[in-house]
């Protein structure tokens, strides 16, 4: 509490002495007003807009006669401490002050802030009227609102408190309130505040004292009218005034009278800020009245006031002090509470300070169980309802028990807090100790020469990494320059980290480190055969590479490109090659890549810059001659960040990759010993310069015999191992595999075949676990129970080929396929011949054909007309009739020139009315003069013909060499004819065919069509 002192000037003492104590004349009201204003003016803070008011009496100070202001210590034994204001025993009407979290207990103080304007105005008026009393009650809900609209929102029992100090901050009031006793709400009071009256001021002049005073006009009085009458000594109503002997205070009677005059006057506070002390008892409120009904009869007010009327002032009554006896139970509870308080203070020093603030001098807590209960409740942080229960409890033993319960909870909380604090402190202490020891160890090592500075250690580490490597001289020069630069940089700078990362990459590369290759042909052959079936071309090329390396005595790099349909083993054969050559394997895909920096790296100036994939490969494999697989090279992208396919030109050029320059390293790196293998499905999308740098090796699709062998040797054992089955659980017959390949897995690769085999084995494993049996044979009869309905029913749409229909052969990225060319005569109604598309001899084409195939159809029509004219001059069918040409399936895009001879044959068959041989299929491009030109995909087309059950093939004569390279298990049983002109094709296709009587025969109904699953495929079938 702050101590304030009001010094009264000697002149005022003289005035008080001559005017009051000598009884020369009654003191004038103007002089009283002057004394009052003078004392208040001395109390104001310099320039502060705060109103601080305290309500104390005072005791005489013998030193200088000043009035001493001090904190309320609630003790009368020390004469040097100020005495407290005498609090009235009964105060029926008090402003209601609602508390949120915990109640205020008697004899304890609390700082309260109020921001509601209505409550602030009420408290200001009460303080100005010297009525600094409030009723403090706990709210039932934890709301933020300060203004109560219903008495049911607060608990009925609270405390009567005195505003000991008040600070007016403008937007809120900050008060120090001290509780005195328990009170109970009996009703609500509505306050009527009259409006302020205008005050007329007048000036009084006292020449004797050289004083001019501004006072209200009604206060200007004379001895007869306005002066306050002084009662005689004999008047019984006159209140006796306490006198202090002169010998005790050492002051003059006049000084004491002046001080007492200032003390006893009822001073009203100024309108602004100020500090007022008064020892006189405040008068009972006169401006308040209880709300009465309109009839004029007074009636009690209910506890619940209307919600529209805010509860500002309540009518209260004192709660009687409970009577108790000092029983053994009370003594035991008291001692236990004191012991618990002692334990809490011992564990948490913060409670010691709180307790010292709560306790008063010379106050024995042990002697007062009521105060002890309130003390324990104030120290604890219990729930508001629990604290309110202690406040309302009237039975002292029960109140002690409740307070003890809260203190025990607080003690346990303090123990837990102490435990957590010890653990955290111990952890921090260990970390700090470890840090100090590490720093000391660094200093000791540095002094002994065991450890060098960080920069020196970094340099030694890099030189140690280059110890067993053959670093080129140009590279070593760059490393030395960077190490020198590193020594001059601050370790916390960004350039230091950039240089350090750069040195990390330079020293991590395998300069001159080469792995020992396997140059044994037998071992390499065994490794390749163990992993893959067939692929003789690839295996032969790898063995040639080993043979050349063996003769030269050194290894070299090569650039190979495996292209073929998906699932034929392009990626897996690369792993086998790496194992056969004893080289490290590294794979990265360039499918969809659009950033050149992925291959050649980023510039070091960029944040997070890294080298390209090839430098990362060398760092990971730690050798200069790994096998690098560049997957999906035909699907490489192109964007605004550059063209990665152009960046591959330097990488895949044997003449340039010996000095490959990465953007990040910016030093030449030798990649000439790296074996590059690229994979692609088609080579048409690969740029010509890049394709020219690679050695292309075609990987064709598998025929049924190859698929069966792969399934028996590789797929089934691996799938059974993965599912935990053995041969005693499952047996897949040869018929089941044939049906699986023919009806479910017709693609060129074996990836789909692997999925179906795994599906069958998983279902068998499920049945084994369910104990439905121990052995499950899989054959053609029960295969549908494992895989469902067949996807492909037949490759042939017609059992007997009708007139105008011929089977052709196509090649796709998925392998070979057979398809039909259908032609038919269009019947044009009258009136439609004016359409240019329906002129005589027109050709209507459908089937989702590309431009190349449409041009091929027009060429075929011209060749067919010329050939038919030479064969049957009188046959004008192709010149006069409207022809419709269709290539199923309509949803599948088709393009390419290789269907030329097939379209001519279909048109000739339609014009002559002769069907072709039933077991024939053909492919070949035709020129305008009827010459048959070579096509590609002979192996795939031959496989498709065998799959469709065709026995006779017509191929261009220039493709004879391609057919002769095919394995015998593909060509066995086939009747193959090689045509030079279309006349050769006609002789083979219409051999031993009897002419029909009609010149135009409509198509027969197809025997079987592909199922919906096969028809849903949308791959492009280019006739190459």
From Swiss-Prot:
Cellular component GO terms, alphabetically? mitochondrial matrix; mitochondrion; peroxisome
GO biological process: one example: oxidation-dependent protein catabolic process
Q: Which residues form the active site?
A: 898, 941
Could you tell me the keywords of this UniProt record?
ATP-binding, DNA-binding, Hydrolase, Mitochondrion, Nucleotide-binding, Protease, Serine protease, Transit peptide
| Gene Ontology MF annotations | ATP binding; ATP hydrolysis activity; ATP-dependent peptidase activity; sequence-specific DNA binding; serine hydrolase activity; serine-type endopeptidase activity; single-stranded DNA binding
InterPro entries, A to Z = AAA+_ATPase (IPR003593), ATPase_AAA_core (IPR003959), Lon_bac/euk-typ (IPR004815), Lon_lid (IPR054594), Lon_proteolytic (IPR008269), Lon_Prtase (IPR027065), Lon_prtase_N (IPR003111), Lon_prtase_N_sf (IPR046336)
Q: Where is this region: Disordered?
A: 219-305, 999-1024
Q: Compositional bias of type Basic residues: which residue ranges? A: 239-250
Q: Where is the composition biased (Basic and acidic residues)?
A: 285-297
Q: What does this protein do?
A: ATP-dependent serine protease that mediates the selective degradation of misfolded, unassembled or oxidatively damaged polypeptides as well as certain short-lived regulatory proteins in the mitochondrial matrix. May also have a chaperone function in the assembly of inner membrane protein complexes. Participates in the regulation of mitochondrial gene expression and in the maintenance of the integrity of the mitochondrial genome. Binds to mitochondrial DNA in a site-specific manner.
Please describe the quaternary structure of this protein: Homohexamer or homoheptamer. Organized in a ring with a central cavity.
Task: State what protein this is by name.
Answer: Lon protease homolog, mitochondrial
Q: Write down the species.
A: Drosophila melanogaster (Fruit fly)
